[in-house]
A protein has these predicted regions:
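Hydrophobic transmembrane alpha-helices and immediately adjacent juxtamembrane helices
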Residues: 2-19, 23-322
């Protein structure tokens, strides 16, 4: 027995005079409409793919341009991305090891891990904040997605962070291979594979802040000055230099009663959770659990949603203020 769809094609209903019935033309018109709909859908998909390819090309070109401009006429060039965190680590280790004497094992590695990750966030958000204003001449001449510019600055900061990991790995290698036996660090191993997950959290979080700041700074230029003050205070409220274990910090605090307030602040400090995550996988060799991953993801998605909302609400008016 033939399938039903074969019977429908093979047997054509005829009218009284042997011609096609009136409904036949209706079936043909329906088939033509379906074909046109499929063609339009395919054209739409191709157009979206082309837009995506163009956007990725623009992002790649902008990141390359910024990278070349940053190291133009520099003798050491890209090596500064490695030397900067090393020099900062050396200075801060000297200061905090002699003045405050926090009981933190492998303090130079502890310090550089906190420094490079916090620097990623501050560089990404600070660059994204001024991206729309810096691209004002281009936005007035070319029709282009405005969110490309804040996103590009975040990706550029991510590239610099990946280069600074060379310095982190160098310090880690020292403690793993050359440190005295009593203070030698065990190689973290498989926990380091969680780094891409952490970077997704931090990049998404930074994109959210960057979108909001880039939109607000177009209308209120004071935001660009205020953000520097905010990040400085944020840096000191985050355990970059001091112990992330607040019980260790209590002995060094002039007023131990502040410990409870600080604990409450840290629970709502996204960078506290991201830096603890970073040290867990690189310094302590532990894989963060589900709860910590959900907290980090929640901060990232909440900030991204806020940034997208602010940016989409205001981007149509950018051209009037840049």
């Amino acid at each position: 027995m033939l399938p039903s769809h074969v019977l429908e094609v093979s047997i054509t209903p005829r009218g009284p005079n042997g011609g096609a019935r009136p409904n036949e033309g209706r079936h043909v018109a329906t088939s033509n409409n379906s074909a046109e709909g499929l063609a339009r859908t395919d054209a739409t998909r191709q157009a979206k793919r082309q837009v995506m390819k163009s956007t990725l090309f623009i992002l790649r070109q902008l990141v390359t341009k910024d990278f070349k401009l940053k190291y133009r006429r520099s003798v050491l060039g890209v090596l500064w991305s490695v030397l900067n965190p090393l020099l900062m680590m050396a200075v801060l280790t000297l200061v905090f090891s002699n003045m405050f004497r926090f009981p933190i094992e492998h303090y130079p590695l502890y310090l550089i891990l906190g420094t490079v990750l916090f620097t990623l966030m501050t560089d990404a958000t600070g660059g994204a904040m001024s991206s729309i204003i810096d691209a004002s001449s281009l936005l007035k001449k070319v029709r282009i997605k405005k969110w490309v510019f804040p996103l590009e600055r975040v990706l550029f900061s991510l590239v610099n962070f990946l280069l600074s990991l060379v310095a982190v790995l160098g310090v880690m290698a020292f403690f793993v291979l050359f440190a005295p036996a009593e203070s030698r660090l065990a190689f973290p191993g498989a926990s380091m594979l969680m780094l891409p997950v952490l970077l997704v959290y931090v990049v998404v979080f930074s994109v959210g802040i960057g979108l909001a700041l880039s939109a607000l700074s177009v209308f209120f230029r004071d935001v660009m000055h205020l953000w520097g003050v905010v990040t400085t205070a944020w840096n000191y409220l985050t355990p970059v230099f001091w112990p992330q274990d607040l019980a260790q910090l209590a002995a060094s605090m002039p007023n131990p009663q502040l410990l409870g307030a600080l604990q409450a602040v840290e629970q709502f400090n996204p960078m506290y959770h991201y830096i603890v995550y970073f040290r867990d996988i690189f310094l302590y060799g532990t894989v963060p659990g589900l709860q910590e991953n959900l907290v980090c993801l929640g901060f990232a998605l909440a900030m991204l949603a806020l940034g997208v909302l602010v940016f989409c609400k205001t981007q149509s008016k950018f051209i009037l203020y840049i």
